[in-house]
């Protein structure tokens, strides 16, 4: 499937998990396709980097579940920071251990571990 075909199957208000860690190994072709789409009000679950910043800048994110959002050399991704400080998005910030165990529980179909 192409990135456009995948994004065409998504709908407003969905929860999307974005793989990778910080600014590394991100599915940026999919992120760019989401940016070109009319999708909105997304809940994004991610160890964030530029992907989260770009989606926040475009107003695509309603809620972000994260452990951190960083560009490494820039400790706090600027577009995410602006969205958070302005109150444009709801956030659930977890420490890295809780975030990782939450993802593991979800993979097993459990509410918690």
Language-model features: locations:
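Conserved alpha/beta enzyme-core scaffold
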Residues: 1-113
């Amino acid at each position: 499937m192409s990135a456009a075909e995948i994004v065409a199957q998504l709908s407003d208000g969905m929860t999307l998990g974005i793989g990778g860690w910080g600014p590394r190994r991100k599915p940026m072709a999919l992120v760019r396709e989401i940016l070109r789409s009319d999708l909105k009000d997304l809940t994004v679950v991610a160890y964030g980097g530029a992907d989260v910043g770009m989606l926040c800048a475009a107003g695509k994110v309603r809620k972000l579940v994260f452990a951190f959002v960083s560009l490494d050399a820039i400790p706090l991704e600027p577009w995410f920071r602006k969205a958070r400080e302005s109150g444009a998005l709801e956030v659930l910030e977890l420490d890295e251990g809780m975030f990782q165990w939450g993802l593991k529980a979800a993979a097993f179909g459990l509410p918690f571990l």
